[in-house]
């Protein structure tokens, strides 16, 4: 059902984009808008992962410096039937994580130092499994495309506002001035709503598949509870500077709230935990992943 809903929302996003393009230049405007979107998506397809990792100051983890963490991620990737992603560390005390990359063969998982300090090895495994689920589902690519579409819609709407929309042969706007202005203001708003709805839908799906990958839904449920509580108290300075990337994290890094809202980047954490607990009660426990040895610190 999640995939059907995502497909419908993507169709709405595309229709909004073409509609704004048509408003600016009629049929030709819609075609030009489509070409612009293709160009923007092609650029982000190849560059978005490097850009977002740089925004958050992430640096690649040396397997020799963190063998336990590296082996855990590799074991989970093997269980998921996917290549081992690159592993990155973000120097912030807020516990959090995200995945990025255009496909499973070119993907990365970034975890914060705060995550490694605050969570147990089992909880870290649950978080990593969630991020691997995003990669396997190609959510990382999907969210890049939706973010690009939303940004392009806002750009086109601003262009239409300053330069005017298309007119008919008599020089009149078919929708009328009020209708044209309404579309220019409402289209970016609607695009943002659709983008966030897709993001929330994919989080639930990644929770479910991530729990299957690690074999213990309660590991992820426990991790979400801890991250939610700490994210409200600990700042993530780089995330605050780059709020457009908030939807990528496992929990909203911008002092996440506990309510489902139209513009919420994530579902209500309590609802996610409840779904995972229900999953744990109804499913047999899978075999354990390779055990992470007890650590004296985040890298030992």
UniProtKB/Swiss-Prot annotation:
The active site is at residue 131. One of its GO terms (molecular function) is zinc ion binding. It is found in: Cell inner membrane. GO terms for biological process: proteolysis. Its EC number is 3.4.24.-. Binds 1 zinc ion per subunit. It comes from the Bacteria. Coiled coil: none annotated. It is a multi-pass membrane protein. Its main location: membrane. InterPro entries: HtpX_protease, Pept_M48_protease_HtpX, Peptidase_M48. Belongs to the peptidase M48B family. This is Protease HtpX homolog. The gene is htpX.
